[in-house]
Amino acid sequence: MFKENTIKLGIAPIAWTNDDMPELGAENTFEQCISEMALAGFNGSEVGNKYPRNTVVLKKSLELRNLEIASAWFSTFLTTKPIEETVEEFIKHRDFLHDMGAKVIVVSEQGHSIQGLMDVPLFKNKPVFTEEEWDKLADGLHHLGKLAQEKGLHIVYHHHMGTGVQTTAEIEKLMDMTDPELVSLLFDTGHLVFSGEEPLYILKKYLSRIKHVHLKDIRQEVVDIVKENELSFLQAVKNGAFTVPGDGVIGFDKVFTILANSDYKGWFVVEAEQDPALANPFEYALKARKFIQEKAGL
């Protein structure tokens, strides 16, 4: 289905230890995490909070297991803080990822975000940017995009539940306001379906701008509970809203077909944050790997 040497398969460490709720998977070590990723048949991962920041140490640990770093999340605060604060941290993050050989930097605006707040209802309290904040976001992303390109990297914007860029309309607005040469898109199946969007619409419309893909599935019965009981994003995660591809309600056949027939070249990263005490990370990594092999031939 996919052209040879176009796709690398990664998996996010958030299934082993949750960055937003470190108590989930606190017992799982960095070495266990990356060893199980390799055993499950993945080529790389994104960066978690237990990963060494010393690039020499990190490279050695990964090379022993034939793994690479695909990318790492970066929180921007362009709508709520002076741009200099975001830029200073971004440059450090960019240089770290450049040293690790990554090609894309995952960015997500966290100004007014409720994704990390345990008791704030996800759908009821979703943030909405003002026009002034949209302008700050677009201008700031252009600046970060130029900084990334100084080292041969691209920024990929992660639309995300509980943030100001979550819905189809918000993704379209961001894409309309930004330069395709400077700002690319991260396509995340799970966040789109969770929000009630049509993922294939976004995939088709912005195919040429998508430079990173997160493969995530949804347990619809949990999403329904989240809406009915006005739960937060973190409560949704703890209750199992997300799972690996093939274990939920999302149909991936068309997603894979569209991407296979495109010029997409890069990473597919399985990102399915759930409680590792309830969903063994290694077992679910194997499930995901088997599903991707069967459905995408990768």
Curated annotation (Swiss-Prot):
Its cofactor is glutathione; Co(2+); Mn(2+). It holds the Pfam family AP_endonuc_2. Signal peptide: none annotated. Keywords: Cobalt, Lyase, Manganese. InterPro entries: IolE, IolE/MocC, IolE/XylAMocC-like, Xyl_isomerase-like_sf, Xyl_isomerase-like_TIM-brl. It is an enzyme of class 4 (lyase). Pathway: Polyol metabolism; myo-inositol degradation into acetyl-CoA; acetyl-CoA from myo-inositol: step 2/7. The keyword Manganese applies. GO terms for molecular function: manganese ion binding; myo-inosose-2 dehydratase activity. One of its GO terms (biological process) is inositol catabolic process. It catalyses: scyllo-inosose = 3D-3,5/4-trihydroxycyclohexane-1,2-dione + H2O. Its EC number is 4.2.1.44. Belongs to the IolE/MocC family. This is Inosose dehydratase. The lineage of its organism: Bacteria, Bacillati, Bacillota, Bacilli, Bacillales. The gene is iolE.
